[in-house]
Amino acid sequence: MSKYKLIMLRHGEGAWNKENRFCSWVDQKLNSEGMEEARNCGKQLKALNFEFDLVFTSVLNRSIHTAWLILEELGQEWVPVESSWRLNERHYGALIGLNREKMALNHGEEQVRIWRRSYNVTPPPIEESHPYYHEIYSDRRYRVCDVPLDQLPRSESLKDVLERLLPYWNERIAPEVLRGKTVLISAHGNSSRALLKHLEGISDEDIINITLPTGVPILLELDENLRAVGPHQFLGDQEAIQAAIKKVEDQGKVKRAEK
């Protein structure tokens, strides 16, 4: 039986989402479409009469800005927002900045799908020579984390994401949900997938089939042990949501010329 409700989402679209590049820990901002997605998400939640007590985000701009726009649409700008690197997008290592379609051409669609969606495959780590290495690791936000800078990831599998996310869920977010607080988590595709895996008990093999579109609110109903009592629900126009999911899935494919 459902006792608690949790809303989570992947942030709105950013420039690198549109350019089909691995964004990861590079601090790309929302583009105009992403801002509109966030506002529409807020409108959807307002229509359903959601009143939030607390919002959790990553430390990346696109996650935080999405939360702000949602709260603005709700008229709930005063609601506290807490940010943690543990909700960051998966660290894609050496793949950061690369175009997914070009990667599919060079390595095959299945390999790119495994890098993007599998549970325990880790891409090659980022090196100091990588064009975005210093932009990431010289950023002040990573000097105030709960782990030393040299212990932050250089590449992650989805399993790694779940392992660094779970302490934050268990120690910070879950207690608020258990107190009856209505919580919004504005995160990323893979940190959201990792949390869904944990709460819904999705298998290591099946998680590869879970794809999340940008800017769509996800409702999870949880029991007294904070386990999902059913599958997650995308809130909104279901036909449009399925089209958005397909768009994300197609990012790792080679475009075929029409005959």
Curated annotation (Swiss-Prot):
Regulation: At alkaline pH BPGM favors the synthase reaction; however, at lower pH the phosphatase reaction is dominant. Inhibited by citrate.
N-acetylserine: modified positions: S2
Catalyzed reactions: (2R)-3-phospho-glyceroyl phosphate = (2R)-2,3-bisphosphoglycerate + H(+); (2R)-2-phosphoglycerate = (2R)-3-phosphoglycerate
The EC number(s) this enzyme carries: 5.4.2.4, 5.4.2.11
Assembly notes: Homodimer.
Annotated function: Plays a major role in regulating hemoglobin oxygen affinity by controlling the levels of its allosteric effector 2,3-bisphosphoglycerate (2,3-BPG). Also exhibits mutase (EC 5.4.2.11) activity.
Domain of life: Eukaryota
Name under which the protein is recorded: Bisphosphoglycerate mutase
Expressed in which tissues: Expressed in red blood cells.
Site entry: Transition state stabilizer: H188
Alphabetized UniProt keyword annotations: Acetylation, Glycolysis, Hydrolase, Isomerase, Phosphoprotein
Annotated active site: H11 (tele-phosphohistidine intermediate), E89 (proton donor/acceptor)
Gene Ontology BP annotations: cellular response to stress; defense response to protozoan; erythrocyte development; establishment of blood-brain barrier; glycolytic process; neuroinflammatory response; oxygen transport
Chain sites annotated for binding substrate: 10-17, 23-24, 62, 89-92, 100, 116-117, 189-190
Pfam families cross-referenced by the UniProt entry: His_Phos_1
PROSITE patterns reported for this sequence: PG_MUTASE
Organism: Oryctolagus cuniculus
Segments forming a coiled coil: none
Gene3D superfamilies, per the entry: Phosphoglycerate mutase-like
Modified residues (Phosphothreonine): T122
Enzyme class: isomerase
InterPro entries, sorted: His_Pase_superF_clade-1 (IPR013078), His_PPase_superfam (IPR029033), PG/BPGM_mutase_AS (IPR001345), Phosphogly_mut1 (IPR005952)
GO molecular function, one term: phosphoglycerate mutase activity
SMART domains: PGAM
Family: Belongs to the phosphoglycerate mutase family. BPG-dependent PGAM subfamily.
Organism taxonomic ancestry: Eukaryota, Metazoa, Chordata, Craniata, Vertebrata
